[in-house]
Amino acid sequence: MKTFEPKPWVVPQPVLIIGTYNKEGVANAMNAAWAGQWDANEIMISMGKHVTTDNLKINSEFTVAFATKKTMVAADFVGIVSAKNDPKKMEKTGWDIEKATKVNAPVFTDFPMTLECRIKEKFNESETGYYLVAEIVNILVDEKYLAEDGNPDMEKMELIVFDPIHHGYIQLGDKVGNAFSDGKALK
């Protein structure tokens, strides 16, 4: 096996779009990949210093949308362009924007699934950013992405993940097994 120095190569990394409002109520979005489930109804996100972190100082509520093959170009755009430098950033995405149902934050309706969140805790704050733990207050799913059982269907969504090794986006594929079940064959 070839060896490598430590790198941020935990994979897959989700492509998450964090939605916030500024003090004037204008929607903003940023792309984040360093995030994950923290507890049953909580997530953790590593936040760098951005317009989004400034907005979260004003209002601790935000949304998290899951990027897809269809939203990839605009999702990448909001990760490389700051609202500080481009006030028309959100217009350029072409996304439809509505107010979330349970938190004071924008929902980008072009995405199949969105978490409505509220910050519970920030830690390791520094000049460059912080980590946040947020409560999932509500989950919105476009009905065309529901399975026959009424729950979200990950395969229908065409979700993408970030490849931190080659700096690409990869679409998630097909279901290959049943969690907490298939391993029983080895008992």
Predicted features along the sequence, with ranges:
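Basic, polyanion-binding surface patches
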Residues: 1-187
